[in-house]
Swiss-Prot record:
Its main location: cytoplasm. It is found in: Cytoplasm. It comes from Staphylococcus saprophyticus subsp. saprophyticus (strain ATCC 15305 / DSM 20229 / NCIMB 8711 / NCTC 7292 / S-41). Keywords: Amino-acid biosynthesis, Arginine biosynthesis, Cytoplasm, Lyase. The lineage of its organism: Bacteria, Bacillati, Bacillota, Bacilli, Bacillales. The gene is argH. This is Argininosuccinate lyase. It holds the Pfam family Lyase_1. It is an enzyme of class 4 (lyase). Belongs to the lyase 1 family. Argininosuccinate lyase subfamily.
Length: 459
């Protein structure tokens, strides 16, 4: 007799290497707790609807919990020839409790069973990701609050542009993560839907109660179409997209961490706990954790593209191609969770080199816009002021000095409206404090940002 759940139709058994190719047990065992959870809900509903007896239901629940406990204690042997975690559990259940275990699958197909497991898994992991993002946001905010008055060069085109505060810069990543978190939160509306009871594709003749299992599994909604229930993988694509975009944001942050920690910048010092050395160069301290996060974006984005390509040509309803929805999602979730934990620890433990940042911003031309604004405030049209300042910058470069060192007579030869107060005006800390527009880098604006953030984080 075949050990296949579908073996009655077949006169030949697949060879072991075919079983290996077909099997998903080596990765879908990740779903075991959700499979047990879904099966217990299904059994309770079957008993409530008098489709199975209360005695059978009790045996099923006791057996499923025992199987899960054995798995968690590494006492459950999984069989590749049984294909997946779902059939492994069913086979083990029947072996332990007999015919009662064989009644569990009444009114259910692996199609809606697997879909239910995946919805439960994705819902749980998205909520876990939201918590990790929030935790990282707290770390960013704590760092920002310590550096509201720390001045650094702001960049465009990786060229120094204008003085900003370190707090303003790092809070940019808070807002990126806030959008990421919002996308994950919104996606729960499309994840938190029960497909259980859709069966293979057309529903079932048994008098099941899909709303009962929805309630037992704490789903907020239920699929209205049984074919849509078993063929929908939009929520997986959406989750992979949200993971990929979050990883892109972490990659951008990682790139800055790598640059900031270089000897050329020396803006920050990373903790030894988040750095590695060289096997040949004993002086090296490498930002490997940041580099790994930057590199893993290709991995998560690849999973997104793979899922889209898997779905693009599939007819309704279920197709075996959909088995490919799991490994990419599991790996993407694992990758983002690890990246968030690493980044949180890396930022929490880094040292901001305040004096180096101040030295850098004093030794550049990032205050040139302020000189133009100074002239505008004296009635010079901005375009004319821009031209004057450009010539002063060129003269300064030719004489190897910065704007704070330009002699007053040189300023006045460029424009007679420039007075001795220009030197105080051009100090980087004053450039920053004069930024008063909403959302700007000025201390009052940054504090306003932080007040808004604290309210959001406490809600």
């Amino acid at each position: 007799m075949s050990n296949k759940a579908w073996g009655g139709r077949f006169s030949e058994q697949p060879e072991d290497w075919v079983d290996e190719f077909n099997a998903s047990i080596h990765f879908d065992k990740t779903l075991i707790q959700y499979d047990v959870q879904g099966s217990i809900a299904h059994a309770k509903m079957l008993a409530k609807q008098d489709i199975i007896t209360d005695s059978d239901c009790d045996q099923i629940i006791e057996g499923l919990n025992a199987i899960l406990k054995d798995y968690e204690q590494d006492n459950l042997e999984l069989d590749t020839s049984l294909e997946d975690i779902h059939l492994n559990i069913e086979h083990e259940l029947i072996k332990r409790i007999g015919d009662a275990g064989g009644r569990l699958h009444t009114g259910r197909s692996r199609n809606d069973q697997v879909a239910t497991d995946m919805h439960l898994y994705t819902k749980a992991e998205v909520n876990a990701l939201i918590e990790l993002i929030t935790q990282f946001q707290h770390t960013i905010v704590n760092t920002a609050e310590s550096h509201i008055n720390t001045i650094m060069p702001g960049y465009t085109h990786l060229q120094r542009a204008q003085p900003i505060s370190f707090a303003h810069h790092i809070l940019t990543y808070y807002w990126m993560l806030e959008r990421d978190k919002s996308r994950f939160q919104d996606s729960l509306k499309r994840i938190d839907i029960s497909p259980l009871g859709a069966a293979a594709l057309s529903g079932t003749t048994y008098p099941i109660d899909r709303h009962e299992t929805q309630s037992l599994l704490d789903f907020s909604a239920i699929y209205e179409n049984s074919m849509d229930a078993v063929s929908d993988r939009d929520y997986i694509v959406e989750t992979l997209h949200n993971i990929s975009l979050t990883m892109v944001h972490l990659s951008r942050f990682a790139e800055e961490i790598i640059f900031w920690s270089s000897a050329e910048a020396n803006f920050i010092t990373l903790s030894d706990a988040f750095s590695t050395g060289s096997s040949i160069m004993p002086q090296k301290k490498n930002p490997d954790m940041a580099e790994l996060i930057r590199g893993k974006v290709g991995r998560t984005t690849g999973h997104l593209m793979s899922m889209l390509m898997t779905l693009k040509g599939l007819p309704l309803a279920y197709n075996k191609d959909m088995q490919e929805d799991k490994e990419g999602l599991f790996d993407a979730v694992h990758t983002l969770k690890g990246s968030l934990r690493i980044f949180d620890g890396m930022i929490d433990s880094m040292t901001v080199n305040v004096e180096r940042l101040q030295q850098t911003v004093y030794n550049d031309f990032s205050n040139a816009t302020e000189l133009a604004d100074y002239l505008v405030n004296k009635g010079v049209p901005f375009r004319s002021a821009h031209e004057v300042v450009g010539k002063i910058v060129l003269w300064s470069i030719q004489h190897n000095i910065y704007l704070l060192d330009v002699p007053l007579e040189q300023y006045q030869s460029a424009n007679e409206l420039i007075e001795a107060d220009i030197y105080d005006y051009l100090k980087p800390e004053n450039c920053v404090s004069r930024r008063i527009s909403y959302g700007s880098t000025g201390q009052s604006s940054v504090q306003q940002q932080l007040d808004i953030i604290h309210k959001e984080l406490s809600d």
